[in-house]
Amino acid sequence: MPPPSDIVKVAIEWPGANAQLLEIDQKRPLASIIKEVCDGWSLPNPEYYTLRYADGPQLYVTEQTRNDIKNGTILQLAVSPSRAARQLMERTQSSSMETRLDAMKELAKLSADVTFATEFINMDGIIVLTRLVESGTKLLSHYSEMLAFTLTAFLELMDHGIVSWDMVSVTFIKQIAGYVSQPMVDVSILQRSLAILESMVLNSQSLYQKIAEEITVGQLISHLQVSNQEIQTYAIALINALFLKAPEDKRQDKHLNPLDLPVTDMANAFAQKHLRSIILNHVIRGNRPIKTEMAHQLYVLQVLTFNLLEERMMTKMDPNDQAQRDIIFELRRIAFDAESDPSNVPGSGTEKRKAMYTKDYKMLGFTNHINPALDFTQTPPGMLALDNMLYLAKVHQDTYIRIVLENSSREDKHECPFGRSAIELTKMLCEILQVGELPNEGRNDYHPMFFTHDRAFEELFGICIQLLNKTWKEMRATAEDFNKVMQVVREQITRALPSKPNSLDQFKSKLRSLSYSEILRLRQSERMSQDDFQSPPIVELREKIQPEILELIKQQRLNRLCEGSSFRKIGNRRRQERFWHCRLALNHKVLHYGDLDDNPQGEVTFESLQEKIPVADIKAIVTGKDCPHMKEKSALKQNKEVLELAFSILYDPDETLNFIAPNKYEYCIWIDGLSALLGKDMSSELTKSDLDTLLSMEMKLRLLDLENIQIPEAPPPVPKEPSSYDFVYHYG
């Protein structure tokens, strides 16, 4: 008899019959099991049937996926994928509209299954669907429901990657683009059309060019002004895709009307006021809360917008380029006025002009006084720093002149070098905003203030250069303190950004509250446990308390594992998310896990989790790139965000249970809890943070009675013995 691990107990349903309770031997061929099931109901031709899940997306069971069947799973006996595909193909071309509609509903549902999709595509199903859409103006006006299911089925089939998107015809593209550009279209059709266009753009450069001929930016903007946030989300996702695929030469010109632009010029349009204001007013400042997927798309849009700066950031200045040198001359002219130009002074010679230029460039704060162009040869920030300086000088001229003249009038040792500061600040902002990096799949931390201005980066630079100048004065800094000042400014900016101000003015106010003295106060408060508790008695007390605190943290981690967590299965973003749950037995001896229909809101019982792993069988915990599921999936492996949340349990005999935590907090909880189960140290960032917090709190509580009392570094000396003990009184 096979070992119990090869036997799975399931229930199998068939319409109009009592369910069969069956023990499936996973070593038997699937065809043999299906024949046994058919014999139980006296069904002929078992080759016409297969098994599929009764719950969730109702996926087919194949030889490749049969090991995913868990104890207690409910299965259905169903028509085989090839037979189902053939039947649906016939029904989709029926003369009866009711039959065709029912067929399309079923097709849209089954197309999410890769086994069925393969069979249907092999029967030229994609071609049939595209022809239905291409001839679909009549369908649109009278049978929008059928068209919506047709587009859903098409998108699901194409998402499997079985066939190339390049096989799509121009007629089909025109039809889909027509649904997007028409003013009154059914919401379901519009949603699927936007999703199809997004996939086309992302998967084929040639299709991008064809779509560009059919849609204008203005047509996409109209979908951002609707009240349906799902439509807005799909519209921004398409905008992001177009932006990402825009040719480099289309990303530079910022002087065109965005509404009339074809989508080949999508990257230009993002710098235009109309598009930005529509997103700001109808999406970010709308009356509805921003959902997770919308927040992600806004984050992607923000990243791609800032990435337009990458070319300038990585461009070195050419000291021999007169046009570039003229920008530096312009900075000098604006700061010191044209009257001081040595070329206007009668009889001024070349040497005299050079001397005056050198003096002015020194006052402007450049490192290379003779040839300041050399200051811009380092990348990053390259020419982007010069762009920022010129923007400040022209748009905020009073601020620029005040900063330059204020510093040039100080003593040499206390002047804040504007040129050097601007270059380093630009580099710092690029690092903080991660200019040039691709968006992460799991992030959604967009900043509303960056959508409030067409030149958000330049405006941010203007605010931060004033902050730098203010902080320099507060620190009474000299040239030797330059790096210290930059560290403080970085801290001020990174402390202000997480508050997500709604406008640049709010950001400026937040920075104003984070003065140098406030930063010192915050640093002192954060270092309190390190700076205030370093005397030997306090260190000894901390060492005595620490094991108790670690035990407390360990119990909390194990309790959280006993409560359990739900983990998302990686899949297509558009498809309904699937979850599975894992929790530790109350006796800490077994891990229970199993699939879920959806994300649970309450407690998941042990009885509903069919699988289990004895803790004694766990050999190791691996994380990140060492996880088997990170090695297998190249797309996931490249996603840094997912990689940082991945971990796997290795257990006997050579099996793995793979996790991707929903967030960093859950990741730390599970890594700590599993490490504690195996008797290893808990080394996560969360444990270090909790240990510091709890230790600090416990120390403060125990030292309350010693407030304002100086604790000596060494114990007091033992006094000498008294000369006599006559003072002792004996009762009696």
From Swiss-Prot:
Subcellular location per UniProt equals:
Cytoplasm; Cytoplasm, Cytosol; Membrane
What positions carry the motif SH3-binding? Answer: 712-719
Q: What is its main location?
A: cytoplasm
Record-annotated PH domain positions: 565-686
| GO cellular component entries | cytosol; membrane
ELMO domain boundaries = 323-497
Chain positions with Phosphotyrosine modification:
48, 729
SUPFAM superfamilies according to UniProt: ARM repeat, PH domain-like
Organism (species): Mus musculus
Which superkingdom heads the taxonomic lineage of this protein's source? Eukaryota
Q: State the organism's lineage.
A: Eukaryota, Metazoa, Chordata, Craniata, Vertebrata
Q: What is this protein called?
A: Engulfment and cell motility protein 2
Look up keyword Cytoplasm and say if it applies. Answer: yes
Task: Point out the signal peptide segment.
Answer: none
Xref: InterPro entries: ARM-like (IPR011989), ARM-type_fold (IPR016024), ELMO_ARM (IPR024574), ELMO_dom (IPR006816), ELMO_domain-containing (IPR050868), PH-like_dom_sf (IPR011993), PH_domain (IPR001849)
